[in-house]
C-alpha cells in the first residue's frame, strides 16, 4: 500500500466512498477535489479493491491529465481517446485514433489494465448506425 493510500484510509470521507464502492453502489462520485487529488483517491480505491476502474471526465484534456497522474501512481492505465473530428471532405484520413481505441478495447478484453479513463464526449458520440438510418 502506498503512503498516500495509508493517509486516505484514515479519512471518514474516503471510508464512506470505499464502502459505497465495496457494496456495489455505483457509480461512485467525489466532488471538490483537485486533479491530483482525484488521481490519489482513485489510486487508493484501486489499491483497496484491486478491481479495474472506469473513470469519466468532463472533457478530453481532463482525461489526458488524469491518465498521466494515475500512471505515475499505478501501471496499466488506459486512455480511451475521443474520435478525431473531420469537418471537411479529405482524400485520405488517418486511422490513428481508431487504432488507439481498438488497442484500448483489446487490452480491456485481455484484462491488462487497472483503469480506463475517458471523457463524457463519448456518451454524446453518435454511432454510425444511427447516422445511416
Give the positions of each predicted feature.
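Short, ordered, surface-exposed loop/turn motifs in non-cytosolic proteins
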Residues: 130-133
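ASCE RecA-like P-loop NTPase motor cores
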Residues: 1-124, 128
Amino acid at each position: 500500500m502506498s503512503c498516500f493510500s495509508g493517509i486516505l484510509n484514515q479519512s471518514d470521507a474516503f471510508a464512506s466512498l470505499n464502502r459505497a464502492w465495496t457494496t456495489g453502489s455505483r457509480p461512485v462520485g467525489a466532488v471538490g477535489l483537485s486533479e491530483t487529488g482525484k488521481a490519489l483517491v482513485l489510486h487508493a480505491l484501486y489499491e483497496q479493491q484491486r478491481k479495474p476502474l472506469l473513470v469519466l471526465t468532463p472533457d478530453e484534456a481532463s482525461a489526458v491529465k488524469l491518465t498521466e497522474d494515475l500512471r505515475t501512481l499505478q501501471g496499466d492505465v488506459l486512455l480511451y481517446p475521443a474520435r478525431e473530428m473531420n469537418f471537411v471532405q479529405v482524400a485520405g484520413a488517418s486511422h490513428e485514433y481508431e487504432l488507439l481505441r481498438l488497442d484500448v478495447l483489446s487490452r480491456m478484453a485481455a484484462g491488462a489494465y487497472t483503469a480506463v479513463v475517458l471523457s463524457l464526449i463519448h456518451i454524446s458520440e453518435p454511432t454510425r448506425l444511427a447516422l445511416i438510418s
